[in-house]
């Protein structure tokens, strides 16, 4: 059976080039449609809203500037993925999920043959020991195989399934 759809999951604020490169490599090798899912969860921002409020309250214009900056970063990540897929001459689509990230990703996995995600994915401001809470929660209820990729891309030499 051939794969029909690979999902590559991205945090648009902390874009993983490794996830992009692994996803493109595998999609090209298997001639599979690649879907870049950008988890634009509205509850997750580059700034810590609670710290802003606690310090001085947040003037509306400052908040709008912070939101605009996040949008630019997320848009640049999606554009980088778009450009890389076009260069690789892949069949691909981009989904910008603006709901709760973990729920959307689990839903996307129902229709995927493979999900690719960075091992350090947290969708938080904090670094966590591996596997992260986000990854552990994702693995509990994913409906397809998951490839958790390292920080740096290296071409795949061999695959061992357990």
Labelled PLM ranges:
Residues 8, 62-66, 97:
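Short amphipathic alpha-helical segments at helix-loop
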Residues 4, 16, 20, 27, ...:
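Gly/Ser-rich helix-loop-strand patches that form or flank binding pockets
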Residues 1-61, 141-144, 151-162:
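Small/aliphatic-rich secondary-structure junction motif
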Residues 1, 41-44, 52, 68, ...:
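Structural beta-alpha unit
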Residues 12, 92-95, 124-127:
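Short, flexible loop segments at the rims of nucleotide/cofactor-binding pockets, characterized by
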Residues 9, 13, 17, 75, ...:
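Short alpha-helix boundary/capping motifs
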Residues 58-75:
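A short acidic, glycine-rich active-site loop
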Residues 34, 92-94, 146:
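Generic structural signal for residues in well-ordered beta-strands
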């Amino acid at each position: 059976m051939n794969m029909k759809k690979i999902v590559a999951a991205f945090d648009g604020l902390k874009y993983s080039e490794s996830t992009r490169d692994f996803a493109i490599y595998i999609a090209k090798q298997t001639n599979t449609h690649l879907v870049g899912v950008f988890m634009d969860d509205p509850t997750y921002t580059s700034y810590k809203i609670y710290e802003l409020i606690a310090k001085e309250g947040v003037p509306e214009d400052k908040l709008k500037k912070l939101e605009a900056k996040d949008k630019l970063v997320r848009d640049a990540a999606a554009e980088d993925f778009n450009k890389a897929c076009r260069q690789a001459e892949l069949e691909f689509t981009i989904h910008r999920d603006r709901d709760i990230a973990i729920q959307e990703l689990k839903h996307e996995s129902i229709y995927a043959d493979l999900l690719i995600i960075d091992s350090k994915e947290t969708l938080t401001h904090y670094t966590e020991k591996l596997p992260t809470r986000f990854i552990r929660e994702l693995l509990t209820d994913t409906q397809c195989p998951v490839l958790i990729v390292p920080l740096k891309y290296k071409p795949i030499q061999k695959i061992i399934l357990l």
